[in-house]
Regions:
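Conserved class I S-adenosyl-L-methionine
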Residues: 62-71
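A short acidic, Gly/Pro-enriched loop at the edge of an enzyme's catalytic core
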Residues: 63, 124-134
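A short glycine-rich, Lys/Arg-flanked "PGG" loop and its adjoining helix->strand segment in the class I
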Residues: 80-84, 147-162
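Conserved SAM-binding motif I beta-strand of class I
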Residues: 88-93
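Conserved SAM-binding strand-loop segment of SAM-dependent methyltransferases
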Residues: 109-122
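A short SAM/SAH-binding and catalytic strip from SAM-dependent methyltransferases
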Residues: 132-147
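C-terminal alpha-helical "lid/dimerization" subdomain adjacent to the S-adenosyl-L-methionine
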Residues: 155-216
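Core SAM-dependent methyltransferase catalytic element
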Residues: 203-235
Length: 235
């Protein structure tokens, strides 16, 4: 004989209170934007001080400059404003998606002085002696073929050209792979690499500190000697 149990009424459904049930979804959508805000626009300007960077490199109107490892173009557009319509800015990156963003914005803003260059992992693919200034910002630690990349930057600079490199400081004595993973690079390692490529160290400009002290950045300034025969032997 089948036992019959009393039929219970259905439990009442909880009614959502405003946007509270949607809060996790909203956080997932907004968090990347909040984190990215420190890497662009006025928030980044406040700690990276792009005008001071360009002053330290001696960049002025009508000059040519390469932004190597440009990403989505934070520095590219500051450089374009400094050199003006008669200048030239090469935005170099190995990510075509980032370069598309730069081209789209440059077209919208009427910045014909910006040219994107799809580089290779060991070659910025810039014309020889084409730029007065080259800049690498927070990207050198990502470069596995660093000697080849610096050789390409050296080749692209005009004699007497200036090369600036901004990177997050780290302790020396670790492997290159660890620097890549930690997104940092000791200043002394950069100086050794640059000297090997033929650059002459000029000075260390004032560095930068990320919000909340998460990272401290140094700023090294080098020069391509006027007489490169002194650093590159004749074949």
């Amino acid at each position: 004989m089948r036992r019959r149990y009393p039929r219970l009424p259905p439990l009442p459904r909880a009614k959502p209170r405003g946007l509270l049930p949607l809060l996790p979804l909203l956080l997932c959508l907004l968090l990347p934007c909040l984190l990215a805000s420190q890497d662009s626009g006025p928030e980044r300007d406040a700690w990276q001080r792009p005008a001071e960077v360009m002053d330290a490199l001696g960049l002025g109107p009508d000059m040519s400059v390469a932004d190597v490892g440009s990403g989505d173009g934070y520095f590219t557009f500051h450089l374009a404003a400094r050199v003006g319509p008669a200048g030239k800015v090469y935005a170099v990156d190995i990510d075509e998606g980032e370069l598309k963003k730069i081209r789209r914005r440059a077209k919208a803003d009427g910045l014909g002085q910006i040219e994107t260059v799809l580089g290779a992992r060991g070659d910025p693919r810039l014309p020889a002696e084409s730029v007065d200034v080259a800049l690498i910002v927070n990207a050198y630690h990502e470069m596995r073929d660093y000697d080849a990349m610096l050789a390409g930057v050296f080749r692209a600079l005009k004699p007497g050209g200036v090369f600036g490199l901004i990177e997050a400081e780290d302790e020396p004595g670790k492997s290159r792979a660890s620097y890549h993973d930690r997104h940092r690079m000791p200043a002394e390692v950069v100086r050794e690499d640059a000297a090997r490529a033929g650059f002459r160290f000029l000075r260390e400009a004032p560095g930068f500190e990320r919000p909340e002290g998460r990272k401290e950045f140094y700023f090294l300034v080098f020069e391509k000697p006027q007489d490169i025969s002194a650093v590159i032997p004749s074949p």
